[in-house]
Amino acid sequence: APANSVWS
């Protein structure tokens, strides 16, 4: 899994 995730 990625270390960060972006939510908009």
Curated annotation (Swiss-Prot):
Q: What are the boundaries of the signal sequence?
A: none
Key words, A-Z? D-amino acid, Hydroxylation, Neurotoxin, Secreted, Toxin
Q: How is it modified after translation?
A: Occurs in 2 forms which differ in the post-translational modification of Val-6. In the form conophan gld-V, Val-6 is D-valine. In the form gamma-hydroxyconophan gld-V*, Val-6 is D-4-hydroxyvaline. Both diastereomeric forms of D-hydroxyvaline may be produced.
> Which residues are recorded as modified (D-valine)?
V6
- Residues that the record marks as modified (D-4-hydroxyvaline) are V6
**Entry's localization field:** Secreted
The principal localisation class reads secreted
Give the sites modified to 4-hydroxyproline: P2
Q: Which domain of life is it from?
A: Eukaryota
What are this entry's molecular-function GO terms? toxin activity
Q: In which tissues is it expressed?
A: Expressed by the venom duct.
Q: Which GO terms describe its cellular component?
A: extracellular region
The family note in this entry says:
Belongs to the conophan family.
Its function, per the record, reads: May act as a neurotoxin.
More about this protein: The mature peptide does not contain cysteine residue.
Protein name as annotated: Conophan gld-V
